[in-house]
Regions:
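Helix-loop element at the rim of GNAT/NAT acetyltransferase active sites that forms part
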Residues: 32-46
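Conserved N-terminal entry element of GNAT/NAT acetyltransferase domains
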Residues: 1-24
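Conserved beta-strand-loop-alpha-helix junction that forms the acyl-donor binding cleft
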Residues: 137-148
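An amphipathic alpha-helix signature
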Residues: 24-31, 49, 53
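Acetyl-CoA-dependent GNAT
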Residues: 60-102, 106-111
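Conserved catalytic-core motifs of GNAT/GCN5-like acyltransferases
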Residues: 139, 157-180
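Conserved acetyl-CoA-binding loop-helix of GNAT-fold acetyltransferases
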Residues: 114-131, 149, 153
Length: 187
């Protein structure tokens, strides 16, 4: 069992625990999440449990990209990925600064039942991402107005609209995406 990378108590919300994805252990759970149509931009709709395991085993071997399973009061609620923007397609669309960290967040199906739930979770995850970095970069789809509004409420400054190039690797295919960059600097 992997030790938690980060534990953050959010008053009135619960204890958020962030731990590295364990590909063998977590693949069945993540498979269900990334195969939903709402997760299409993760590029894994139609994958098998074994393919999800292999993708996260590959991710685990990288020094630039990291996958984390997020739990709230010991219940898995999200998949959180961090990455070095210069080693990712987003790095082709803006000038990355030293200390930047990119993040992707996938909320588990059936969670976030109360207004403000995702915002409280995001507060803990941003604190985790900014422990040793100075700025978080996100790239939600331009059509995802809900996610963009959530980022603004969380204090992110909107950046330009960009087109992220497609990624076609043996492990995953991610189509070209129109994205709205947003940035949150550590205060």
């Amino acid at each position: 069992m992997t030790t938690a990378a980060y534990v953050h108590r959010v008053e009135g919300f619960g204890t958020v625990t962030v731990r590295p994805v364990e590909p063998e252990r977590d693949a069945p759970l993540l498979h269900g999440w990334v195969n939903e149509e709402r997760a299409a931009f993760w590029g894994m709709v139609g994958t098998t449990v074994e393919q999800v395991r292999d993708i996260y085993a590959h991710l685990d071997s990288l020094t630039t990209h990291h996958g984390f399973l997020v739990s709230l009061d010991d219940e898995p609620v999200a998949l959180f990925q961090t990455y070095d923007p210069e080693a990712d397609r987003v790095g082709e669309c803006y000038e990355a600064l030293p200390g930047d960290i990119g993040v992707h967040l996938l909320i588990a199906p059936g969670t976030a039942p109360q207004p403000g739930w995702t915002g409280r979770l995001l507060t803990a995850l941003v604190a985790f991402a900014l422990r040793d970095r100075t700025r978080v970069v996100v790239d939600p789809d331009t059509a995802n107005e809900k996610a963009i509004a959530r980022m603004v409420r969380a204090g992110f400054e909107l950046g330009p609209e960009v087109v992220l190039p497609e990624v076609d690797l043996p492990e995953v295919f991610i189509p070209e995406k129109k994205a709205r960059l947003a940035f949150l600097a550590r205060r």
